[in-house]
Amino acid sequence: VALPEVYGYLLSRCGRRALAEDLTAETFLAAVEAVRRPDPPELTTAWLIGVARRKLVDHWRRAAREERGLHAIEGGLSPTDDPWDERLDALVAREVLEDLGPHHQAALTLRYLDGLPVPQVAELLGRTVHATEALLVRARAAFRQTYADHVKEGRDD
């Protein structure tokens, strides 16, 4: 049931059928591996889309790393190509997002990272627009609290 939604999600973001097919396969392979764990997650469409998004991000990271490597070999990297603070903030934000529950992760990812409007997020999550708006309010609050906890832990170390 979720296969067309996961594939459509990936295809709409990467624009390449072969890549979308590969990432869809990787997503469902990750789902099979997750089910084999002692405490498996609830396999919902939202959870699968979250996994698919991470697979796509991983693909883009690998491609960017390869491109940077080629650029470095050609001698084109400058010190300004390494915005450390931005990367650190992004890393903390990613860790915080991964600490949230699957519904909060999916809602925040679709709305803010993928830039989808609330009605489309609602459709993908199988919720009403009103229920999705309420979910986003709770998800943002959970993100803020978890982010504050991460920042506090970082200072305590």
PLM segments and residue spans:
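Internal acidic/polar
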Residues: D58, E66-E95, P117
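Helix-turn-helix DNA-binding module
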Residues: E98, P102-A106, D114-A134
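Arg/Lys-rich amphipathic alpha helix in sigma70-family domain 2
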Residues: R36-P40, I49-H71, E86, D149-H150
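Amphipathic, Lys/Arg- and hydrophobic-enriched alpha-helical face
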Residues: V1-R17, V32-A34, L97, D149
